[in-house]
Amino acid sequence: MIHIEKIPNGSLQENCYIIADGTDALIIDPGSDAERIIDTIHKLNVIPQAILLTHTHHDHIGAVDQVRDAFSIPVYVHELEQDWLNDPEMNLSAQFTTIPVTARPAEFEFTLYQEYHFGKLHFTVVPTPGHSFGSVSFIFNDFVIAGDALFKGSVGRPDLPTGNLDQLLTAIKTELFSLPPETVVYPGHGDETTIAQEQKNNPYFN
C-alpha cells in the first residue's frame, strides 16, 4: 500500500511529497523546512532511497542538501536543469528571495520515459516542459506527481525563463491527459485533482 505524505512548505507553500511503500520511500521536491521533512521521515519510520526533482526553481530545491546529507541519498534531476541547482539567477532565488538558494549538483540525471525502481516503488519519468524547459512528471501506478506543470484548475506559470505556454499545454495533453481519467494528480502547489477533473474543468483546456 503506497502512502503519500504532502508537506506544504515555505512562503509559496510548495508541496514536498514523501512517497512510501513499506519502509521504502522517495522524497520529491524538498523546497524548504528541512527539519520538518526530516522529522516527518523519522515519524513515518521509512528509509528514503532518493530525492527526485520535478524542476529546479528555488521553492522546490531549498532543502535539497540538508535532506540529502541527513540520509546520504542521491538526487535526480533533468539534465537541462542540472546547472540551475547552483545558479541563483536560473533557479530564480536571485529575483524572488533575500538569500540566494543553491545546492550541489545532482548525482544522477533522468533518462526520459525510463521506468525507475526503488525497492517496492516504481515510476516513469516523462517530460512536461513549459513552466521550465527541464520540468518532468513522475507517473506511478494510479497517480502522477506533476510538479508545476498542471494544477487544480490551472497550469504552471509560462512567463519565467525558458517557459512557453504552447509547449506546456502540449506536454500536458500529450503526457498527462493520456493517463487514465481516474489518475490522481499531485501538483507542486495546492490541492490534488484528477485527470478527468482537469480535462473537464481546467479553463486552459476548455
Named regions from a protein language model:
Residues M1-H3, F118-H122:
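Conserved N-terminal entry element of GNAT/NAT acetyltransferase domains
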Residues M1-L44, S137-G147:
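Conserved beta-strand hairpin/beta-sheet module of binuclear metal-dependent hydrolase folds
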Residues I7-P8, E107, P127-P129:
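Short Gly/Pro-enriched turn/cap motifs at secondary-structure boundaries
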Residues E14, A25, Q82-D83, G134, ...:
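Glycine-centered loop/turn positions within well-structured domains
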Residues I19, T54, T128:
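Conserved S/T- and glycine-rich ATP-binding loop of Class I adenylate-forming
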Residues L26-I28, L52, V75, I145, ...:
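Residue-level marker for buried hydrophobic side chains located in beta-strands
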Residues D33-H117, P203-Y204:
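Active-site HxH/HxHxD metal-binding segment of metal-dependent hydrolases
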Residues N91-A94, H122-N206:
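Metallo-beta-lactamase
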